[in-house]
Design a protein with these regions (language model features):
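Bacterial N-terminal signal peptides
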Residues: 6-16
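N-terminal secretory signal peptides that target proteins for export/translocation
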Residues: 1-3
Length: 286
């Protein structure tokens, strides 16, 4: 049975130097995390911590994905959006719901502090006009506020938001939020977010802003296409590089029409990166 697998590989030789791991024992900080924002090749790294998202989604399975919080704050009129355990960092905050201009205020309590280290209303923190929360790392766009300014913490981070006044009909305000958290391995040294930011952190964020504003991807290296006539063969490539396209062409003329769906389910695509003995990708062709 004939099957052709086509793989288009575009190597990114020059720019890949930025993909090296950080020295062992180096502390995670705003500056080190901002360096990753300035290097799009970090997106392809598999050795990075998982990301967990805390959101206002409808816990009943419905479509009312607003107004759901972790719990009430000890301060009346405030809600706890997330109570995170360290070490770790928040990589993204997204918020919407202030349709009438209500200045929802946020509080960020780091490492068990009783006084918020960082606080401000949604426009100040995520509107893209106040340092270091400047566009395009933080911005108001399409009725939403967001920030990619990293917020590292050694012991923990509690994020609270002002609930706001009720709507005219007495129903709770429709507040939507997303908070992306990455937990770090226990014992990882972390420089907790400081306010005001040290100059080193400000400079790193400015570099990331410049890269994002330029909207320039790493220069492509040599492109080559590999065709495999035998489905049992494995294609191997030396890195660094990027796979841009996978194309599969079964010899349909030799497969009865009633068997084609089953064949697509039986054929498995397996991809392993960087010498791993485990599949990073394993899925049926169809």
């Amino acid at each position: 049975m004939k099957h052709v697998w086509r793989i288009l590989l575009a190597a990114v030789w020059a720019a890949a130097a930025g993909c090296g791991g950080r020295p062992a024992g180096e502390a995670a900080s705003v500056a080190s995390l901002a360096e990753r924002l300035a290097d799009p090749l970090w997106l392809a790294r598999l050795d990075q911590p998982d990301t967990r998202m805390h959101t206002s989604y409808d816990r009943t399975g419905g479509n009312n994905d607003y107004g759901t919080f972790l719990r009430d704050s000890q301060t009346p009129g405030w809600k706890v959006l997330a109570d995170l355990k360290g070490p770790g960092f928040v990589s993204r905050v997204w918020f919407t719901g202030a349709k009438d201009g209500y200045p929802h205020r946020f509080r960020f309590y780091f490492d068990g502090e009783e006084t918020p280290r960082l606080e401000g209303d949604v426009k100040e923190l995520f509107g893209g006009k106040q340092a270091p929360f400047l566009a395009p790392l933080a911005e108001y766009n399409n009725y939403c506020w967001y920030s990619f300014v990293p917020l590292p913490y050694a012991k923990g981070l509690r994020i609270e938001c002002e609930e706001g006044t009720r709507d005219a009909d007495g129903s709770p305000r429709k507040v939507y939020y997303q908070i992306s958290e990455s937990a770090l391995p226990r014992g990882t040294p972390v420089e907790t977010f400081a306010w005001p930011l040290p100059e080193r952190d400000v400079a790193a964020l400015e570099q990331a802003r410049a890269v994002w504003a330029a909207k320039k991807l790493p220069e492509a290296g040599e492109r080559r296409e590999t065709a495999l006539a035998d489905w049992s063969q494995a294609a191997s490539f030396a890195g660094p590089g990027t796979i841009h396209r996978l194309e599969f062409e079964p010899d349909w003329e030799k497969i009865p029409e009633e068997s084609r769906d089953a064949a697509l389910r039986d054929w498995m695509v397996s991809i392993r990166y960087d010498g791993s003995t485990n599949d990073s990708v394993r899925m049926p062709l169809g």
